[in-house]
A protein has these predicted regions:
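FIC/Doc superfamily catalytic core
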Residues: 1-315
Length: 315
């Protein structure tokens, strides 16, 4: 590979998906990123961690990852637990990585694999074969990665395309002795996050996990074809699905919040905002947004003052 753009074609599918992603991002941003509540943010991060690990055969799953994040002890092999801890630490620094700096990618690999590999953070020194794919010789890896990052830094491609192209080229080079899949997916997220921080909230890796066979087939198809096009199309589809999933989850979460607030008001018409916050584990601003929405929809009304009044349910 040289500094030229890796080979790919702009297909009608790529154009359509790019447009759809832009439209869905606008929907997500229209309400503000704060609309995605902290619980959903945490849930999506856990989905991301579980997804990227399960693709590599670590099936500790969302429940145990949640427990680990909460500081609880869980059962698992030393390697499984080390992989989870490494993934948690690597993704915690998502906002700090510079997408076009090779040293930052090496740092990410060091963090991810530190308890697993003695060579964590260093390129492989041996030749490897992945399935039917014979990766470039170990002696070529450093130059190939320098060139890939030079292209990443200097090319004019849209960041959506850059993220997909980088992901495939990285997997093709296979620069590390282990952890390539996890780093490839992480770095696509880093590139997307640098384009728009809202991408850090999306569980794209968990969607890829659900389409794991298609993921590997897209890599194989691109390798056979000698260009990135099949993989770009596949990953754009995964990004689109992850945005749609988040929109639906957030809408469902907000609907549930509305119903919970309403149920508590029906149970106790004199319930205060503070009591609602306590019972539902929501912030004051979150409760006030729900109340405003219910008022705007003419479902509730406040009779009297906040101190001595009560809620009137109109439905």
């Amino acid at each position: 590979m040289n500094n030229n753009t890796p080979p790919y074609k702009i297909t009608s599918k790529i154009l359509k998906l790019s447009t759809q992603i832009s439209e869905e991002l606008t929907k997500l941003q229209f309400t503000g990123t704060q609309k995605i509540n902290p619980m959903l943010r945490k849930k999506n991060r856990i989905k991301t961690l579980a997804g990227t690990l399960e693709i590599e055969g670590n099936f500790l799953g969302e429940e145990k990852i949640t427990a680990i994040l909460d500081g609880k002890r869980v059962l698992g092999t030393v390697k499984e637990l080390a992989e989870v801890q490494g993934a948690i630490k690597a993704y915690e620094k998502l906002d700090n990585y510079r997408f076009d700096e090779l040293d930052d990618l090496l740092l990410a690999h060091k963090i991810l694999m530190d308890e697993i590999l003695t060579t964590a953070g260093s390129f492989r020194s041996v030749n490897v074969k992945v399935g039917e794919h014979i990766a470039p010789k170990a002696s070529m890896v450093n130059e190939l990665m320098i060139n890939l990052f030079s292209w990443l830094k200097n090319s004019d491609e849209h960041m959506l395309l850059k993220s997909c192209i980088f992901h495939y080229e990285f997997e093709f080079i296979h620069p590390f002795s282990d952890g390539n899949g996890r780093i490839g997916r992480l770095w696509q997220s880093v590139i997307l996050n640098s384009f728009n921080p809202i991408f850090s909230l999306l569980p794209t890796e968990s969607i890829v996990r659900d389409y794991q066979e298609e993921y590997y087939k897209a890599i194989e198809d691109s390798t056979e074809l000698g260009e990135n096009t099949p993989f770009i199309e596949f990953m754009l589809e995964m990004i689109f699905k992850s945005i749609q999933t988040t929109l639906k989850s957030d809408q469902k979460s907000n609907y549930k919040s509305d119903q919970k607030v309403l149920a508590l008001m029906k149970e106790n018409s004199k319930i205060t905002i503070y009591e609602l916050m306590e019972k539902l584990s929501m912030s004051e601003s979150g409760i006030k947004k729900v109340i405003k929405k219910l008022k705007d929809e003419n479902i509730i009304n406040r009779v009297g003052s906040l101190k001595s009044g009560h809620w009137e349910i109109k439905e």
